[in-house]
């Protein structure tokens, strides 16, 4: 529904059902499914396909999520839209491959080195899995940003009857494309909202992109502190500009309560009912 047309992944419990499902579904809608040799390669393939213009997805669990961190950092620095699903399991290391946990929340936020923001969405129901998947792709394309869907083994295996909206009613956001000429275009020159526009690959636009600190033209400037400060400030600011679109929560109970419990994913399933008035 969100327009995903490329998946690269490596089977890992308890996220393998996503890989299996995409292997069946994507060819039916003209998409591409790739089973890669490992988690690092699958992250790199998703980044590359997104750079070429596709809406991309990859899925994994704890050990694979660790291996994808460098790629997530690259996507953040190069401002490449990509959705990463982490179906959490118990850890550390190989951990408990078939049992649930919520142990990856800190890694989801601070798993990469360097100072960059990240968007994390955490569904608690099958309906939210559907809705937040669409939201993840929309935010990734709108803000040019990797987005993590933080699920878990319980939520990932839930079966519920839900009502799906008509496809015509689903809001789908595509990436902004430049209106400037190839001579004027700079791949990292931001618009008013702090987000640069893309240019079509395979067209007259020829430009450079790298994961170093870079100029608006995309060339390395990794010894220039002024360029680095300006770039990092913009990477943070563009998310702040869309804070209202990113942030979402549900409140249960009385607003004059003395105790506030914050929950997400599987834990929300267990505490939402007891906290109702």
Q: What is each PLM-predicted segment?
A:
Residues 1-110, 117:
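Thiamine diphosphate
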Residues 67, 91-94, 128-130, 156-160:
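Short, well-ordered, mixed-charge alpha-helical segments that flank or form enzyme active sites
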Residues 273-277:
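Short, small-residue-biased leader/transition segments that mark boundaries at the very start
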Residues 2-3, 23-29, 85-87, 111-117, ...:
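Gly-rich Lys/Arg/Thr-decorated short loops/hinges at beta-loop-alpha junctions or inter-strand turns
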């Amino acid at each position: 529904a969100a327009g995903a047309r490329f998946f690269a992944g490596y089977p890992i419990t308890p996220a393998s059902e996503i890989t299996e499902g995409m292997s069946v579904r994507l060819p039916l809608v003209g998409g591409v499914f790739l089973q890669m040799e490992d988690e690092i390669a699958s992250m790199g393939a998703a980044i590359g396909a997104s750079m070429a213009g596709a809406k991309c997805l990859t899925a994994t669990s704890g050990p694979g999520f660790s291996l994808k961190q460098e790629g997530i950092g690259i996507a953040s620095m190069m401002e490449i839209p990509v959705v990463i699903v982490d179906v959490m399991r118990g850890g550390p290391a190989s951990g408990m491959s078939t049992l649930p946990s919520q142990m990856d929340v800190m890694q989801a936020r601070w798993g990469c080195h360097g100072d960059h923001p990240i968007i994390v969405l955490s569904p608690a129901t099958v309906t939210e899995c559907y809705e937040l998947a669409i939201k993840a792709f929309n935010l990734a394309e709108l803000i040019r940003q990797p987005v993590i869907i933080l699920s878990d083994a319980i939520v990932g295996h839930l079966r519920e009857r839900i009502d799906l909206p008509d496809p015509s009613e689903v809001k789908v956001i595509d990436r902004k494309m430049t209106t400037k000429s190839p001579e004027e275009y700079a791949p990292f020159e931001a618009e008013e909202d702090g987000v640069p526009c893309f240019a079509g690959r395979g067209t007259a636009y020829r430009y450079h992109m790298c994961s170093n600190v870079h100029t608006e033209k995309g060339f390395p400037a990794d010894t220039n502190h002024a360029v680095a400060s300006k770039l990092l400030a913009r990477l943070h600011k563009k998310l702040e500009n869309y804070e209202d679109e990113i942030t979402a929560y549900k409140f249960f109970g009385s607003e004059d309560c003395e105790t506030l419990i914050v929950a997400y994913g599987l834990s929300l399933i267990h505490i939402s009912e007891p906290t109702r008035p």
